[in-house]
């Protein structure tokens, strides 16, 4: 079972919050106290809350649920993509486009356009165009890939969001709330935990902390997918 210990979190600097003057009072229950002008997060709270979140992620993945990893901060972009690919899930790591969930119909059309352009680039269509037209289509394809590449195979709305930085990704959180999609999020001391179903109080800036959250989440999803595959195999075996 995917689990994270207190030692793991201390080594990754999960307990370092923001400067005290930037705090959100709603985070008070999860703060141990100030140290040198910085709020220290109470890991006695974070450890069980994160492990509870991991159990739920495993359950969702075990029911063949789709997990969308969201993290567009510079410190998170590469790690978010790597974690999602590691567990064969989906990601948004460049910029959250307003309506990405709530206006899925339009997003689906853009994904269709992206796939169409990819086909054109591979089947020789681009070679038949003028240099200028080929360049314009290549740029359009690259722009769409940057925004939608991580969700182009999602095939519908996700069953959960795993968010690095609830504050930074507040639009994504709000859209998920509107659609009743559960939100798992790292919530720092300057953030608002409202709208987050599974609050994980922790540092949302440090690369090592971000890596810890994502590695554990990916492991939890893989565990769920494995359980799902084993259940299917047993079902087929019994049917035979």
From Swiss-Prot:
Gene: rpsB
Record key words, sorted: Ribonucleoprotein, Ribosomal protein
Species per Swiss-Prot/TrEMBL record: Pasteurella multocida (strain Pm70)
Record-stated family: Belongs to the universal ribosomal protein uS2 family.
Entry-linked SUPFAM superfamilies: Ribosomal protein S2
Record's keyword annotation contains Ribosomal protein: yes
Record's protein name: Small ribosomal subunit protein uS2
GO molecular function: structural constituent of ribosome
InterPro entries listed in its UniProt record: Ribosomal_uS2, Ribosomal_uS2_bac/mit/plastid, Ribosomal_uS2_CS, Ribosomal_uS2_flav_dom_sf
Gene Ontology BP, a term: translation
Record-linked Pfam families: Ribosomal_S2
A Gene Ontology term for the protein's cellular component: cytosolic small ribosomal subunit
Superkingdom of source: Bacteria
Keyword Phosphoprotein attributed: no
PANTHER family per the UniProt record, alphabetical: 30S RIBOSOMAL PROTEIN S2 PROKARYOTIC AND ORGANELLAR (PTHR12534), SMALL RIBOSOMAL SUBUNIT PROTEIN US2M (PTHR12534:SF0)
């Amino acid at each position: 079972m995917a689990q994270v210990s207190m030692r793991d979190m201390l080594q990754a600097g999960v307990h370092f919050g923001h400067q005290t003057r930037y705090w959100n009072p709603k985070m008070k229950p999860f703060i141990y106290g100030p140290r040198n002008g910085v709020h220290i997060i109470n890991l006695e709270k974070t450890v069980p809350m994160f492990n509870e979140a991991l159990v739920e992620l495993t359950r969702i993945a075990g029911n063949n649920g789709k997990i969308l990893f969201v993290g567009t901060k510079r410190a998170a972009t590469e790690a978010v993509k790597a974690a999602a690919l590691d567990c064969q899930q989906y990601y948004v790591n460049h910029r959250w486009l307003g309506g990405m969930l709530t206006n899925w119909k339009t997003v689906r059309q853009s994904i269709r356009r992206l796939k169409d352009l990819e086909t054109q680039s591979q089947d020789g269509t681009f070679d038949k165009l003028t240099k200028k037209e080929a360049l314009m289509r290549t740029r359009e394809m690259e722009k769409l890939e940057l925004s939608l590449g991580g969700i182009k195979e999602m095939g519908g709305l996700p069953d959960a969001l795993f968010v690095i930085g609830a504050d930074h990704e507040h639009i994504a959180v709000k859209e998920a709330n509107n659609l009743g999609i559960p939100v798992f999020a790292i919530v720092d001391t300057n953030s608002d935990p409202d709208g987050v179903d599974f609050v994980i109080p922790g540092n949302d800036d440090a690369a090592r902390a971000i890596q810890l959250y994502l590695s554990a989440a990916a492991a939890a999803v893989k565990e769920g997918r494995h359980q799902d595959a084993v259940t299917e195999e047993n079902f087929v075996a019994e049917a035979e």
